[in-house]
Amino acid sequence: MAKVISIHSFRGGTGKSNTTANVAAVLAAGGARVAIVDTDIQSPGIHVLFGMDDRPEPTLNDYLWGKVGIRDAAHDVTDRIRRIATVADGGALHLVPSSIRPGDIARVLRDGYDVAALNDGLRTLARELELDYLFIDTHPGMNEETLLSITISDILIVILRPDRQDFQGTAVTIDVARRLDVPERSEEHTSELQSRGLISYAVFC
């Protein structure tokens, strides 16, 4: 069963998406089956790190609005890793991007979306792609979508900048995660990620 890893920050500009992309790429290069879902629907951008078009299609938005299945919105970006590193047998990386179209972003801001459908889609994606790891690149701050991501996660990584506002906001995030009973298996997962040289700065709960 896939381990669900949410990478979150209280504010934007912390390097959250870059961290998500790099950790996922290292795991895939090591032979794991990995996927990233960009749930930062209001300000998407992780697709740029993988050299995708400015307007990748289909997207997570298309799935949430019932236009395509979640598997159809998952783009295989393994070849992007192969350009800079050797990928072990079996390794693969898929990305489900969010739409960068202004109209789609405006629709999300205006109408929102069904968070239950997102939850179902994540589970379906993990099953159909036979994933080892599923990364959720969250929207900064605290909202309904972020709380869902935290709730279904096996691991929560919170990235922050060394300033007072981030420290305070991150403390709130960690407290909420504990109240939502994020599985208390962080030591096991931390050791696993450390053994792969993947943890540099993170807060686990």
Model-derived segments and their meaning:
Residues 25-29, 48, 151, 175:
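Short, well-ordered alpha-helices that flank and scaffold nucleotide-derived cofactor binding pockets
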Residues 71-72, 80, 88-139:
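Cytosolic-facing regulatory segments adjacent to core modules
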Residues 46-47, 106, 147:
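A short local structural element in Rossmann-fold oxidoreductases
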Residues 116-191, 195-196, 200:
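Conserved catalytic-core segment of NTP-binding enzymes
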Residues 2-42:
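Walker A/P-loop phosphate-binding motif and the immediately C-terminal alpha-helix
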Residues 42, 101, 165:
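Conserved Rossmann-like nucleotide-cofactor binding loop
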Residues 12, 46, 63, 96, ...:
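Residue-level signature of catalytic and energy-coupling elements of molecular machines
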Residues 33-34, 42-95:
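Phosphate-binding loop that captures ATP/GTP phosphates
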